[in-house]
Amino acid sequence: MELIIISGRSGSGKSVALRALEDVGYYCVDNLPLPLIPELAGFLSNSGRSAVVSLDIRNIPENPESIEALLEQLSKLTIQTKIIFLDCERNTLIRRYSDTRRLHPLSNKDLSLESAIDLENTLLEPLYQQANYIIDTTNISSHELAENLRGILRGSTDKALKIVFESFGFKYGLPADADYVFDVRFLPNPHWNPELRPMTGLEQPVIDFLERQTEVHNFIYQTRNYLEMWLPMLEKNNRSYLTIAIGCTGGKHRSVFIAEQLAKYFQSRDKDVQIRHRSLEKHHKK
């Protein structure tokens, strides 16, 4: 039995997350007032049930000590508590609100949309810092968000650590869900070869180019060794996901190739591996 608290920025997908978890059998409560959460946790502890609670910014006090006191109170109960925080880039949130023409929950404070988003970010910081999992919904669909959540919940009963290798472009910003970020912008760049420029790191000519570079081989080898050294400690740390982000300038060539190579290596070592390329979709849209 466990209590899962879902919070995050307004517009980041909390309603989608709640529906997804309800679909897999969790008892879900939307916008439960903060003081009532310990009562729900006590009920769950006695009944042996699990539940999901979403926390809206309107139910979160401005005093961060209230959240810390709640978490301390929950830690004294026998039920396991996890916090999942949904994050999203500021510009994406602005676009989502513009598309739906809905009001931000803090707009009643006579704030502009941009100011409301920034204030909410400040108020949510204590929960962000306490979160067990952070999911960046900027570039993922509702289906992908639901799948990520199901993966996290499967990890609650499956002790195997899932290693996620993701490529990204620094020009689009850092992925918020990354545990480790490796910068490969110093490596030889296929972008400067006119024939390779329109291709990606998944295509054979780019693969051949990068495989000829000694620096690329050295980077992969040393990164692999670093991860292998610390994986046993991370696996003992009772975590479900380890997200390793590889970034180049545009997330199209070098980071894609290296993420693929690292993923293949750890798959060959019987690790539970997932791979995603965050920025490739942006290039396909051009």
Curated annotation (Swiss-Prot):
Residue sites binding ATP per the record: G8, R9, S10, G11, S12, G13, K14, S15
Gene3D superfamilies: P-loop containing nucleotide triphosphate hydrolases
Transmembrane segments: none
A molecular function GO annotation: ATP binding
Keywords of this entry: ATP-binding, GTP-binding, Nucleotide-binding
Residues holding GTP: D56, I57, R58, N59
InterPro entries assigned: P-loop_NTPase, RapZ-like, RapZ-like_N, RapZ_C
Alphabetical list of Pfam families matching this protein: PapZ_C, RapZ-like_N
Family, as annotated: Belongs to the RapZ-like family.
Function: Displays ATPase and GTPase activities.
Cited HAMAP family: RapZ_like
Name the record gives this protein: Nucleotide-binding protein APL_0334
